[in-house]
Amino acid sequence: LSSLNYNGAFLYNGTWVKALETIRNNNADLRWEKKHEFNVGLDWDVLGGRLGGTVDYYIRRTKDALWDYEVPVPPYMYPTMLANASEMENKGLEILIRATPIQTEKFTWNTNVSYSTNSNKVVALSSEKFSMDQDYFYTGYTGEPIQTTTHIVQVGKPIGTFYGLKSVDITDDGLWLVENKKGEHVLAEETDATDWQVLGNGIPKHYLNWNNTFNFFNFDLSINMRGAFGFQILNYQRMYY
């Protein structure tokens, strides 16, 4: 798959013709990502269908995930190439309970509660043909004025992992104190990349949803409540100060 773009022009038979150039390396082996999934579930109903639910467990593995890998120049024209080489695994449980607590000629109340949890991890970042120098890379970006990454993607760790210096206090002079790799509290300016650590994860581990529908003659009322639990939020603005 080649990508071309116009760049300049040249004179041909007395006419100026726009020139085309390749803007990224061609990868003839580029293909769709593959997903393999194992799923087992249970559906149940009692009381004439007024109470029921489902339970579903799955293991999902995504292979041949896409990423830009470094390649030598030459023989390639550009230093990176989009290729299928990564692999990720997800495991999860989904539970739904539905009920009709009240059902009369004039009024009906339907309700359902759902819960889901999912855990994922990076299984591989390299293949036989495309590889990285290490089993991780940094991603995410805060922009001005800090200019630093915010996440790490590493084999064996989940997607969405926050990675950086762990702030623990501020000195009387207003300088940041952080925790180094030995667990000591030192000035931020005295640290290096080896002192960075996992700070949390921005992807919720648990979701809970409660939906209610009320029917009274020709009127309907729906109320839905949804919650996400077991995650951290990156205070992007506070990182500036």
Residue ranges: model-predicted function:
Residues A99-Q103, F216-N218, G227-F229:
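Beta-strand elements of well-folded, non-transmembrane domains
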Residues L11-V46, G52, T139-N224:
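Outer-membrane beta-barrel transmembrane strand signature
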Residues T62-K63, V186-L187, G230-Q232:
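A short local loop/turn or secondary-structure capping micro-motif enriched for an aromatic residue
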Residues A228-Y241:
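Extracytoplasmic gating/loop element in the C-terminal half of outer-membrane beta-barrel translocons
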Residues D56-I59, I223-F229:
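Active-site proximal loops enriched in glycine and acidic residues that flank catalytic Cys/His/Asp
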Residues L1-I146, T150:
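Extracellular/periplasmic, surface-exposed regions of secreted and cell-surface proteins
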